[in-house]
Regions:
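Short, well-structured N-terminal submotif of metal-dependent ribonuclease cores
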Residues: 1-39, 53-67, 71, 118, ...
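Alpha-helical transmembrane segments and their juxtamembrane interfaces
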Residues: 16-18, 109, 127
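Generic hydrophobic alpha-helical membrane-segment signal
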Residues: 28, 34, 42, 87-88, ...
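Short glycine/serine/threonine-enriched helix-capping/active-site loop
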Residues: 39-42, 79
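Phosphate/NTP-binding elements of NTP-utilizing enzymes
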Residues: 47
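Active-site neighborhoods of divalent-metal-dependent phosphate/nucleic-acid chemistry enzymes
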Residues: 59-63, 70-118, 131
Length: 134
């Protein structure tokens, strides 16, 4: 089963693993072993923006952090036109562009989205999701 991790989930995975629940960790490990652990390319943009804005501290530049993520076997999914259009068309979804792109990426890939974002978890749309704290 493919899983797509929300940005904060990958941040937790890379340095705050204790914030991830046991079920989420197990699912990510299993997916990574099958080349089914995914991250939206947009998450790397989001991390770089948070670092540049001083809202997130990293032990290395964002480019080096990205390389470490990819070395774990996590597959980077580019933002396509299909993803962009679907992101814009999500009904009754929060307006945050990153959340929209990440959710649309999960939907187009048929992946379970692992997130702790309450707004995404509460959304009524057809999305397989798992609370990252579980």
């Amino acid at each position: 089963m493919a899983v797509l991790m929300d940005t904060h989930v990958v941040v937790w995975l890379m340095g705050r693993i204790q914030q991830l629940g046991r079920e989420s960790r197990g699912l990510i490990e299993t997916a990574a072993g099958a080349d089914d652990a995914l991250i939206s390319a947009f998450s790397f943009w989001e991390v770089a923006m948070l670092v540049q804005g001083g809202r997130l501290q990293m032990p290395q530049p964002a480019a080096g952090w990205r390389q470490r993520v990819l070395e774990l076997g996590i597959q980077e999914i580019p933002v396509s036109g299909e993803i962009g259009i679907l992101a814009a068309e999500l009904e009754n979804f929060p307006r945050d562009p990153a959340d929209r792109i990440i959710t649309a990426t999960a939907l187009t890939r048929g992946a379970t989205l692992i997130t702790a974002d309450a707004r995404i978890l509460a959304w009524q749309g057809q999305l397989a999701r798992l609370d990252a704290r579980n």
